[in-house]
A protein has these predicted regions:
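Anionic, Ser/Thr-rich low-complexity intrinsically disordered regions
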Residues: 1-30
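Catalytic machinery of carbohydrate-active enzymes
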Residues: 31-290
Length: 290
């Protein structure tokens, strides 16, 4: 029965997405769950697969998120009407009783919490969030999806005829490496796209186009990253996004902090995936040289 219900939910998602007039009706009691993971943008992208997985087990799921991240999340799940959000303040602290009370008062059937248990260890990021819930690692790969937004297509169309690279060097800990080091290694006719900052002077040929590509939502850069000749990123939300994208080229680099205890470049060796549907790429370590 449970698998039949899941198949129905998946068919409903497809029908909703294509706006089909053929709507199958089911007579079972509707269920809903609330999901709480870590609340950074990168954490939400990491947990995209588990959220979409649980959205096939329940008729609707609600994801805890900070107010400042709501817009990004709405875009991550724009294609699925069964996924909604409960906003909390930036200083939110997980208190089990409060979450359980909220769930009970709002008639949720289940509370799904990952990453808020005191004894949790995070050596196996990002897969530990799935292990905490006893989910197989392939849920991370196979259920991940962020739709291609019109804005993503618009931004990519504006630079698709340029020779360009994508660089993101900032995370919650600040600036991780100097973009100027990359400028020294590339042809002057190569456009450097950074989502947070325009590195060109106002009289430079690339200033205007680089300016139009700054400060957009994370999902808006999907096609730009997928088609970049070179990607160079630090351990940030953009890296969390990029490892599950269909990158066109092989030169994709990750800057690893010196005290990091988890080598993300070996993810694909330890946690294999089926690459027949999405051509994911391995990452190389960036050591100020591309």
């Amino acid at each position: 029965i449970e698998e039949n219900d899941r198949r129905f939910r998946v068919k409903k998602k497809i029908n909703d997405f294509i706006n089909s007039s053929l709507k199958e009706q089911k007579g079972y009691a509707r269920t809903k769950a609330i999901i709480l993971t870590h609340l950074g943008n990168g954490d939400h992208i990491t947990c995209n697969g588990l959220v979409r997985y649980y959205s096939t087990k329940y008729d609707s799921v609600t994801v805890f998120c900070k107010k400042q991240n709501l817009h990004n999340l709405e875009e991550f799940y724009e294609d699925d009407k069964s996924i909604s959000f409960h906003c909390v303040e930036s200083d939110f602290i997980y208190r089990p009783r409060e979450v359980e009370k909220y769930a009970k008062n709002n008639n949720y059937n289940n509370v799904i919490v990952s990453g808020h248990i005191k004894d949790n260890t995070y050596d196996d990021l990002p897969f530990c969030f799935y292990q905490f819930l006893d989910l197989p690692h392939n849920v991370f790969w196979n259920y991940f999806h962020v739709p291609t937004l019109p804005k993503s297509q618009e931004l990519y169309n504006s630079i698709k005829n340029y020779d360009y690279i994508f660089v993101h060097n900032q995370c919650s800990r600040g600036e991780m490496f100097k973009v100027e080091e990359i400028f020294k290694q590339i042809n002057e006719n190569t456009l450097v796209i950074n989502p947070c900052k325009n590195f060109y002077s106002k009289n430079h040929t690339f200033y205007s186009i680089a300016q139009t590509l700054c400060n957009e939502s994370i999902a808006s850069y999907k096609l730009i990253m997928e088609n970049a000749r070179i990607n160079v990123v630090c351990d940030s939300s953009f890296f969390c996004f990029m490892i599950n994208l269909e990158l066109k080229y092989d030169d994709n680099f990750l800057y690893k902090v010196s005290n990091g205890n988890w080598d993300y470049t070996k993810i694909f060796e330890k946690y294999s995936f089926d690459n027949t549907k999405i051509n994911r790429k391995k990452f190389k370590l960036f050591e100020n040289k591309i």
